[in-house]
């Protein structure tokens, strides 16, 4: 990935410096922020994009699998945010962009762990938007649907869900097939990047930016339908 970024930066003649950072490592986060401050003296934008998917029925997920999911998707985001907030507060400016998901708006089968992390990110982001407004710091949620990236390949299936004798095996097969099709029809990563750019360059950014026709449709249905109707619609898609 580093080589790809460097190649793209060279092609576009962009002055890009790469700094290694592991969101689950407190020391790594602190060292990265210190390195950036030494080089630039300020931090205007933080984009929390680290994350992965964990797929599996709740009954078959281990507590350790769920904890690891939260460690990256939620606690990692908190680590980086806490590290930059004193800097942005002193500057009296800054934008924190949290890459959430349509999964931060509604649940779906096999996604209990992943969805829970995104619901947590949504709640945290909305809460700190009030806290940070007084310091000129803006908070933004980017909520993509399916995107044509390698995220589907980075999604991990719980160990037990791969058991051929799993009572959830047929459900998981249907979900995997449906997800693969949706990724193929998903939006481009450039569309997500455009939403981020719009948010960080706006004087008054929205709290939430939905990205993708699929997620726009689902959220619209979620708002207009009763819980029972939305449940039936989602279940029908797996039948």
Where are these regions (language model features)?
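A glycine-rich helix->loop->beta "capping" turn
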Residues: 13-15, 35-48, 54
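The beta1-alpha1 cofactor-binding region of Rossmann-like NAD(H)/NADP(H)-dependent oxidoreductases
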Residues: 21-31, 63
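Substrate-binding pocket helix/loop in short-chain dehydrogenase/reductase
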Residues: 57-58, 65-67
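Active-site helix of classical SDR
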Residues: 81, 117-120
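A short, exposed helix-loop element centered on a Lys and neighboring polar residues
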Residues: 81-82, 126
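Residue(s) in the substrate-gating loop at a strand-loop-helix junction
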Residues: 101
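SDR active-site lid
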Residues: 134-206
């Amino acid at each position: 990935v580093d080589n790809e970024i460097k190649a793209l930066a060279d092609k576009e003649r962009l002055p890009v410096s790469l700094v290694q950072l592991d969101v689950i490592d407190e020391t790594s986060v602190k060292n990265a922020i210190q390195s950036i401050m030494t080089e630039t003296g300020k931090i205007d934008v933080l984009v929390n994009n680290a994350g992965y998917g964990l797929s599996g029925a709740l009954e078959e997920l281990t507590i350790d699998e769920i904890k690891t999911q939260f460690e990256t998707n939620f606690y990692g985001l908190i680590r980086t945010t806490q590290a930059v907030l004193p800097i942005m507060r002193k500057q009296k400016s800054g934008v924190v962009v949290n890459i959430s998901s349509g999964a931060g708006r509604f649940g779906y089968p096999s996604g209990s762990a992943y969805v829970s992390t995104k619901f947590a990110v949504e709640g945290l982001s909305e809460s700190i938007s009030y806290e940070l407004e007084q310091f000129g710091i803006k908070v933004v949620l980017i909520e993509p649907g399916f995107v044509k990236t390698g995220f589907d390949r980075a999604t991990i299936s719980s160990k037990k869900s791969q058991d051929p004798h799993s009572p959830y095996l047929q459900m998981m097969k249907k979900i995997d097939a449906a997800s693969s099709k949706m990724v193929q029809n998903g939006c481009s990563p450039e569309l997500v990047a455009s939403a981020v750019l719009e948010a960080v360059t706006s004087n008054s950014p929205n709290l939430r930016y939905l990205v993708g026709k699929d997620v726009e449709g689902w959220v619209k249905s979620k708002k207009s339908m009763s819980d029972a109707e939305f449940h039936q619609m989602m279940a029908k898609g797996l039948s």
